[in-house]
C-alpha cells in the first residue's frame, strides 16, 4: 500500500522517488520487499568475513536483478547505532580498496557503501574522513559509492567526498532529531492538544527545513 502511495505522489509531482530498503541483513525480508515492489535494496553483510559477505550478497543480487532491482552492498564496518543495530566504535573497520574492487566484481552489486571514517548516530567528536582512501577506492571501483553515517559530518567534508566519487549520501539522525525536538516542544507547550495535524505539522516542517539544507549541500537540487 505504501509503495503504491509513493508512486502516486511521484507521478503527481513529476519527480523521481526511489523506494529503497536500507540496512537489511535477513535474506527473506529483502526478497519479500522486492516481491511487493521495492526497486532498490541494501544487503548489509559487512559484519561477516569477506567471503561470507560476498556469498550472501551474491544471493540477493541474483534474485534482485531478475526484477531490475538495484542492490547496494557494504564493505567495511561503521560504528554507532542504526535503528536497532548497535556496533561499538572499536569494531569499526575501514574499507580496503583492493578488496573493494574484488567485492564489486564478484558480487555484481550496483552501488557500494564504504567505511571511510563515518559512523551511525551522534558523533562524540568531529569526524575526519579518509579522503585518500576514498580516492583509492574510486580509482578501482566504477559503480556509485555510498556514504553512510553522514549526519554531523561538516559540509565541507561531505562536499569533498562527493567530489571524490560519493554518489549517495545517507542522512537520518540530523532529520530525526529536529522532528523529535519540535514534537516534544509542541506537546509540552500544548499538553491538551489531541489533533495529530497540530503537532505533527510543525515537526515535519522542522525536518523539511533540514532536508532542504542537505539537498543544497549535496548539490542534489533540481536533479
Model-flagged regions — what are they?
Residues 192-200:
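Short beta-alpha connecting loops at secondary-structure transitions
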Residues 116, 148-151:
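Short catalytic/ligand-gating loop segments at beta-alpha or beta-beta junctions
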Residues 200-203, 207-211:
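Family-specific functional microsites
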Residues 2-13, 23-141, 155-171, 177, ...:
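Alpha/beta enzyme core
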Residues 18-22, 71-72, 146-148:
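Structural detector of well-ordered beta-strand residues that form the stable sheet scaffold
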